[in-house]
């Protein structure tokens, strides 16, 4: 088999790297090793700065728009908010060019943003007032319904209590009559003299201390008969 040689590929690779390193200082453009290192580093920087460039331009556009808006008596954030509410599809690049090159047309955009912000605030206040009125009406309705429900509950509870009382009275009446019927009558003749004197004192018999037992018994019978 024939021997394979990598010299053509190696030469192409070296020429490619040295071509990319053309214009570098010193050995970075002549020697392959240092040129390759510098090219790899340069490619990384280029990848990073392609993205950083977009950020830098956005900062520049915002600073130009802010400067133009401050000259017209408005902030950048309020200007962009007003244009968004007005549904103006103009990007920051165009606005920055207008603020830098055509300040009169840029002032018209600022005026449009101011008017839309005023209209938005008015509509927002109207909606707030309507919402507060609705909340007041709803709170009043809730309070009325709560009062009605509380009154209904009180009525129901009072009716239930009256029914329970009537049922309890009907149930207890025969028991009371039975107890009264079963209540034994006092046998005064079998009681002792001090017990009779206590009863006489309770029933307010006059001069019970001077009376005899038979007299106290007769007086107590008369007092109990009156009751």
Curated annotation (Swiss-Prot):
Gene3D superfamilies: 1.10.720.10, 6.10.160.10, Ribosomal protein L20
SMART domains linked to this entry: Rho_N
Function in brief: Binds directly to 23S ribosomal RNA and is necessary for the in vitro assembly process of the 50S ribosomal subunit. It is not involved in the protein synthesizing functions of that subunit.
Keywords assigned: Ribonucleoprotein, Ribosomal protein, RNA-binding, rRNA-binding
One GO term describing the cellular component: ribosome
Protein origin, superkingdom: Bacteria
Stored InterPro entries: Rho-like_N, Rho_N_sf, Ribosomal_bL20, Ribosomal_protein_bL20_C
Annotated GO biological process: DNA-templated transcription termination; ribosomal large subunit assembly; translation
Family per similarity comment: Belongs to the bacterial ribosomal protein bL20 family.
Molecular functions per Gene Ontology: rRNA binding; structural constituent of ribosome
UniProt-listed Pfam families: Rho_N (PF07498), Ribosomal_L20 (PF00453)
Protein name: Large ribosomal subunit protein bL20
């Amino acid at each position: 088999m024939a021997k394979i040689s990598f010299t053509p590929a190696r030469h192409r690779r070296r020429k490619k790297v040295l071509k990319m390193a053309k214009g570098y200082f010193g050995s970075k453009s002549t020697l392959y090793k240092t040129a390759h290192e510098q090219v790899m580093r340069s490619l990384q920087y280029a990848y990073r700065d392609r993205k950083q460039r977009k950020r830098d331009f956005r900062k520049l556009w915002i600073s130009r728009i802010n400067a133009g808006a401050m000259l017209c008596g408005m902030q950048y954030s309020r200007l962009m908010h007003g244009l968004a509410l007005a549904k103006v599809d103009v990007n920051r690049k165009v606005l920055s060019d207008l603020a830098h090159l055509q300040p009169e047309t840029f002032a018209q955009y600022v005026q449009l943003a101011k008017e839309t912000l005023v209209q938005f605030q008015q509509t927002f206040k109207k909606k707030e007032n309507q919402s507060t009125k609705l909340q007041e009406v709803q709170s009043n309705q809730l309070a009325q319904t709560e009062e009605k429900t509380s009154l209904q509950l009180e009525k129901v509870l009072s009716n239930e209590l009256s029914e329970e009382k009537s049922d309890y009275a009907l149930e207890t009446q025969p028991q009371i009559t039975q107890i009264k019927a079963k209540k034994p009558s006092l046998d005064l003749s079998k009681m002792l003299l001090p017990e009779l004197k206590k009863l006489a004192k309770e029933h307010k018999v006059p001069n019970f201390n001077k009376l005899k037992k038979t007299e106290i018994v007769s007086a107590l019978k008369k007092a109990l008969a009156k009751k």
